[in-house]
C-alpha cells in the first residue's frame, strides 16, 4: 500500500440559502415590539426595519402600515414623544446645540413640525453660549493656544450644532487673535 493515495471526499461549498421567512401581521408586530423594546424609534425607523423583513412579500407594505397603526394606537410608537425625549437627552447629557438635534431628527425621519415643537421646548430657556462652554468642558477642550487649536475648537462646535455667532463670541472671550477669527469667519462664510 505504499503507492496508494487516499482521496478525501469533496465537500461542496455551495451556500444553502434559507428560505425567506414570511411574516404575517402578528409576527411582524412581535418583531416591531422587540425592536422598540431595545430602544425608542421613530415611525420612519420602524417602517424601514419592517420593510426589510417583508420586501419579498406582495402584501408587505400593507402589513407594515397595519402594524404601524397598531403600534400608534397602543402608544408604543410616537414621533412627538420620541423627538421631545431625544432633544432633551442630547441637550442635557451630550450638550449638543439646537442645529445638531434638528439635523439628527430629520435624518431619523421625524416630521419638520414635530421637530420644531420638540426642539423649541427643549432649547427655549437655554443660553447657547453656556451650553457650548459645557460641551467644550465635556470634551476636555481647553482655550486654544494657536490657529490650529482654534480651528479644531471651531470645527468641534460647528459639528455639535452651535451657531457660528456663538462660537466666535466664545473665541473672542478667549482672546483668540483677530487674524485667526477672521480666517475662521471667512471659511465659515460668515
Locate the predicted segments by residue.
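An alpha-helical, amphipathic repeat domain used for nucleic-acid recognition
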Residues: 2-190
Amino acid at each position: 500500500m505504499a503507492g496508494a493515495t487516499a482521496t478525501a471526499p469533496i465537500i461542496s461549498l455551495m451556500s444553502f440559502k434559507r428560505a425567506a421567512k414570511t411574516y404575517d401581521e402578528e409576527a411582524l408586530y412581535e418583531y416591531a415590539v422587540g425592536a422598540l423594546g431595545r430602544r425608542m424609534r421613530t415611525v420612519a425607523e420602524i417602517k424601514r426595519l419592517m420593510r426589510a423583513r417583508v420586501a419579498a412579500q406582495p402584501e408587505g407594505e400593507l402589513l407594515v402600515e397595519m402594524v404601524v397603526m397598531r403600534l400608534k394606537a397602543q402608544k408604543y410608537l410616537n414621533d412627538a414623544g420620541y423627538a421631545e425625549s431625544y432633544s432633551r437627552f442630547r441637550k442635557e447629557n451630550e450638550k449638543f446645540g439646537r442645529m445638531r438635534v434638528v439635523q439628527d431628527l430629520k435624518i431619523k425621519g421625524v416630521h419638520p413640525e414635530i421637530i420644531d415643537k420638540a426642539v423649541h421646548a427643549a432649547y427655549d430657556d437655554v443660553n447657547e453660549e453656556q451650553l457650548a462652554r459645557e460641551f467644550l468642558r465635556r470634551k476636555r477642550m481647553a482655550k486654544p493656544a494657536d490657529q490650529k487649536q482654534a480651528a479644531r475648537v471651531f470645527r468641534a462646535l460647528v459639528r455639535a450644532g452651535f451657531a457660528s455667532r456663538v462660537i466666535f463670541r466664545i473665541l473672542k472671550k478667549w482672546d483668540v487673535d483677530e487674524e485667526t477669527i477672521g480666517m475662521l469667519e471667512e471659511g465659515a462664510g460668515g
